[in-house]
Amino acid sequence: MNHNEIITHALNQLMKSVLKLEKTTNIPQELDAVEGRRFLLRMLSASVDSFVEYIDADRPQFRHSEGPHRKMFGDCPDADYLQATIDLRNGRSYRVRGTIPQGTNYVGVMLYGRGGRIGVCITDEQLEIGNDGLFEILISANPEDNPTLLGNGDEHMVMVRQYFTDRNKQPPMELEVEFLGDVPEPKPLNSAWLAKRIELSRRMLESIFMRTLDAYRRISNFPKNTFVDVPVDLLFPTPDNTYKICWYELETHQMIIVSGILPKA
């Protein structure tokens, strides 16, 4: 295949996956079916972002992975999810610097490995934070570097979570990430590279849907109107949280009242 045909083939395979996955959203309830298709479009966008756009591990930048217009899995509307691409192979290392405002509820920094594997994590309670809120984290897979977060070598992403109770009063943290090494010149775009990244986007899209459908099947078997604990390995969570889910059905003119007791800090 020539350079145009390589890209066309990759795009065709991606579109075939989209059409195949679209059939899984053929749900009897109209609203659920519409939401399923919107979720498909959002995950397509997220997959392309992850493997075509925001992929420079030599010049990483933090970006919001979720927001008002892209909901993924069980993300919390009262949290910011900031992610940056990294590559810990061949002794590479990174420095994360930031400022945590006073009164911040929670900050967690986590590495993710191949296939979404949950890596090491550190929270604001474990960080060395200055009086001005400044902190610094060293990320490496080399124990001799004495890193703050020691990876296995397959990590491709660092994610920072910040939780809020009142966004109007609690400012977002300042954050930056830097590759600690000689930054090479950017490589020119070529068809083989782009075709490979499109294929990786396709695989991510299918993986997201398979994991989401698996989670749906598991959760839908839970007893109705009863909160149950969800395994922390389900849908890229943080191990610092406990996740409880209640499966419910509402008839016309019904409502749900959720009550509980908050634990003392």
Regions found by a protein language model. Name each.
Residues M1-A265:
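A compositional/structural signature for long, glycine/proline-rich flexible linkers
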